[in-house]
C-alpha cells in the first residue's frame, strides 16, 4: 500500500507525542538514569517498541514515516528498506509494505555460522537502501548498520528514526553523508513552558522536573 497523503509536519510530531504518552512509552527517572544505546545516561527514555502492540497507532505512525520520506527524500529514491537488529526489523517490514519495497535486515555482527551473514535478505550491489531504527540519539547504532550495508555494496544516503532525541548526532550524520529523517523529537514530547496547553503537555510537565529540561538543554555529545 503506497502512502500518498501528506499531513503537516507539526501535526505529525504532535500526534506521535500524544500517542507515546497515551501508551505510556515515555519514562522519567532522575534518581536512576537510563543507559541509552549510545552509552550515555539519560533521565528520560522512550520505548518506541511499544508502538508495535497498538495496531491503530502503529499504522498511523507508518503513514507518518512514509509521508515524511516521500515528501523529503522523493518517490523513487530507494530500492529497499533495511531494519537494524532488533527494534528496527519490525518497523522496516511495516514501512517496506507501505512503500511497496523489498525489505532486508542487518545484524549487529555476522551471525558466526552458516553463511556468516550480517545482512539477511536480497540486496543487489548498488541498491539504494534506507536504514530505519525506532529511535536514535547520537547515531552510533544506526551507523553500525549503515556501515554494514555500505560494506556489502549498498548505497545509503538516508536514514529514518521514528523518534530523534534532537540534541545530539546532527554532526555525526553530516560527517557520514547521511540525511536523517524523523517524525518527532523530545522538543515535541516535552513542550516549552510557553506552548499551548494540551493533555499531553500537562502530563509531560507533571512528569518532567527541571533536571529533564537541563539534560535536554545540553548542546551536543562527543561521539
UniProtKB/Swiss-Prot annotation:
Q: Which Pfam families match?
A: Pribosyltran
Claim: Transferase is one of the keywords in the record: yes
Per UniProt, orotate binds at 137
E.C. code: 2.4.2.10
Which GO BP terms sit in this record? 'de novo' UMP biosynthetic process; pyrimidine nucleobase biosynthetic process
Keyword terms, alphabetized: Glycosyltransferase, Magnesium, Pyrimidine biosynthesis, Transferase
InterPro entries attached here?
Answer: OPRT (IPR023031), Or_phspho_trans_dom (IPR004467), PRibTrfase_dom (IPR000836), PRTase-like (IPR029057)
The effect of pH on activity is described as: Optimum pH is 10.
Which terms in the Gene Ontology molecular function aspect does this entry carry? magnesium ion binding; orotate phosphoribosyltransferase activity
Please tell me where 5-phospho-alpha-D-ribose 1-diphosphate binds in this chain. Answer: 107-108, 111, 113, 133-141
Q: In which pathway does it act?
A: Pyrimidine metabolism; UMP biosynthesis via de novo pathway; UMP from orotate: step 1/2
Compositionally skewed regions (Low complexity) per UniProt: 192-211
Say what the protein does: Catalyzes the transfer of a ribosyl phosphate group from 5-phosphoribose 1-diphosphate to orotate, leading to the formation of orotidine monophosphate (OMP).
Q: What is this protein called?
A: Orotate phosphoribosyltransferase
User: Which species does the entry assign this protein to?
Assistant: Rhizobium leguminosarum bv. trifolii
Q: What's the source species' lineage?
A: Bacteria, Pseudomonadati, Pseudomonadota, Alphaproteobacteria, Hyphomicrobiales
Amino acid at each position: 500500500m503506497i502512502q500518498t497523503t501528506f499531513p503537516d509536519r507539526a501535526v505529525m510530531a504532535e500526534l506521535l507525542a500524544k500517542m507515546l504518552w497515551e501508551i505510556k512509552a515515555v519514562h522519567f527517572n532522575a534518581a536512576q538514569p537510563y543507559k541509552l544505546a549510545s552509552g550515555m545516561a539519560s533521565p528520560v527514555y522512550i520505548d518506541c517498541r511499544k508502538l508495535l502492540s497498538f495496531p491503530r497507532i502503529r499504522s498511523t505512525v507508518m503513514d507518518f514515516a512514509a509521508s515524511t520520506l516521500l515528501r523529503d527524500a522523493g518517490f523513487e529514491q530507494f530500492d529497499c528498506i533495511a531494519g537494524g537488529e532488533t527494534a528496527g526489523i519490525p518497523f522496516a517490514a511495516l514501512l517496506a509494505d507501505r512503500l511497496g519495497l523489498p525489505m532486508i535486515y542487518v545484524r549487529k555482527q555476522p551471525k558466526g555460522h552458516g553463511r556468516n551473514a550480517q545482512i539477511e535478505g536480497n540486496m543487489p550491489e548498488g541498491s539504494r537502501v534506507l536504514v530505519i531504527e525506532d529511535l536514535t540519539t547520537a547515531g552510533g547504532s544506526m551507523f553500525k548498520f549503515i556501515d554494514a550495508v555500505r560494506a556489502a555494496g549498498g548505497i545509503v544516503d538516508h536514514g529514518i528514526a521514528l523518534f530523534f532525541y534532537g540534541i545530539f548526532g546532527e554532526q555525526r550524520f553530516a560527517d557520514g553523508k547521511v540525511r536523517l529523517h524523523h517524525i518527532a523529537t523530545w522538543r515535541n514530547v516535552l513542550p516549552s513552558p510557553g506552548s499551548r496547553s494540551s493533555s499531553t503537555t500537562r502530563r509531560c510537565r507533571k512528569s518532567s522536573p527541571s533536571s529533564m529540561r537541563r539534560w535536554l538543554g545540553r548542546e551536543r555529545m562527543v561521539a
